[in-house]
A protein has these predicted regions:
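C-terminal outer-membrane/trafficking sorting elements
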Residues: 122, 185, 206, 297-370
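Canonical leucine-rich repeat
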Residues: 66-69, 88, 109, 130, ...
Length: 370
């Protein structure tokens, strides 16, 4: 009888031991609400109730700790965004496919033991580094509003969507990410960006960096480009797909004189979000003409109407003006002084460059003669 009692007590002890500690009451309350635990809150949940769970949504629950998540061993999808987490251990959740832990206070995140991870969103945390070298299945990474200074993407060839806005990146190598279709690297410290290998790219936004040049001529699928507020002096958009663009922004690049495009006339008609100092050109020869007599003091004038058939008017400067008009071969075809009105009716139809100077500063602008 005594032996039977000991065996019974042993089985009872094993039975009672199959619980998982849940120290955070808000986490346990969320599990109660989902039907994985029963009230009242007692700091634990039956392990059998959670070991087969594949989807767990516990976002915006004021949770400070997800301790206990390690026993969700079948978990594929975890949404724990907008909580108060300062740490998150998913090393035991090896089946994890999607993880959204945005809007917390994480200073580190280890996903090295999650090889099946396809989607990772860790926006608005305090991450200074992130190692995704083991996540070769990853197709989307959202890591906006963190403190990353570098990111190694060399093992992530499956990536299609990459969002790294508002970090502290000084360089970004996407040469191995040839499946990339969407790239957001807004508000970093990038001085260069090479996307020549990313021929599948359709959307690129890189505003608020320190880029001095950008060449998207190899990105034949691109239909959206936003490079506002950089330090561009060279921008090549001749990708053969300009007429399919739905977004083009290049303002606040005051040193950008020439923007190389497929068809300068089409771009001038359809793309308006450029600086007044920038001009669309078809080739380097046209850009050379625009740079004639380059002067660091740019004259602020407007010309109208453009296109024109008979006269060009110049407004915005009351000083005596010297005006020269060049064809695209660089030949001066009109020269005038001390006037704000130029007759161009005798010019052949086509594109011309007008140089306007007041003796101190000058500007070059393109116009079309009908």
């Amino acid at each position: 009888m005594k032996k039977l009692m000991l065996i019974f007590l042993g089985f009872t002890s094993v039975g009672f031991s199959q619980t998982t500690e849940i120290p955070d009451p808000n986490f346990e309350q969320a599990l109660i609400d989902l039907g994985y635990d029963n009230a009242p809150i007692n700091g634990s949940v039956p392990t059998a109730n959670i070991s087969e769970v594949t989807l767990l949504e516990v976002y915006d629950k004021n949770i400070s700790s997800l301790d206990g998540i390690e026993d969700f061993t079948a978990l594929n999808y975890l949404s724990c965004f907008d909580n108060q987490l300062t740490s998150l251990d998913v090393t035991n959740n090896v089946a994890l496919i999607q993880l959204n832990c945005s809007g917390n206070q994480l200073t580190s995140l280890d996903v090295s033991n999650n090889p099946a991870l396809d989607f990772l969103s860790c926006n608005t945390n305090q991450l200074t580094s992130l190692n995704i070298s083991q996540n070769t299945a990853l197709t989307e990474l959202d890591c906006i509003d963190n403190q990353l200074t570098s990111l190694d993407l060399s093992n992530n060839a499956a990536l299609t969507n990459l969002k790294l806005q508002t970090n502290q990146l000084t360089s970004l190598d996407v040469s191995q990410n040839t499946n990339l279709t969407f790239l957001n690297c807004i508000n970093n410290q990038l001085t260069s960006l090479d996307v020549s290998n990313n021929t599948a790219l359709t959307y690129l936004t890189c505003r608020f960096n320190q880029l001095t040049s950008l060449d998207i001529s190899q990105n034949t699928a691109l239909t959206a480009l936003d490079c506002i507020n950089n330090q561009l002096i060279s921008l090549d958009v001749r990708n053969g797909n300009n007429t399919n663009f739905n977004i083009f922004y290049s303002t606040f690049n005051s040193d950008l004189i020439c923007i190389f495009v497929d068809d300068a006339d089409w771009s001038a008609t359809n793309w308006t979000n450029i600086d007044s100092t920038s001009t669309f050109v078809n080739n380097e020869a046209e850009c050379d003409i625009l740079s004639l007599g380059d002067n660091s003091l740019v004259l602020d004038v407007n010309i109208y109407p453009n296109p024109t058939a008979n006269y060009l008017f110049i407004e915005g400067n009351k000083n005596p003006l010297a005006i020269s008009i060049y064809n695209l071969l660089g030949t001066e075809v009109v020269s005038e002084f001390n006037t704000h009105k130029i007759e161009v009716s005798e010019l052949s139809k086509g594109v011309y460059i007008i140089n306007v100077s007041d003796g101190v500063s000058q500007t070059n602008k393109k116009f079309i003669k009908n």
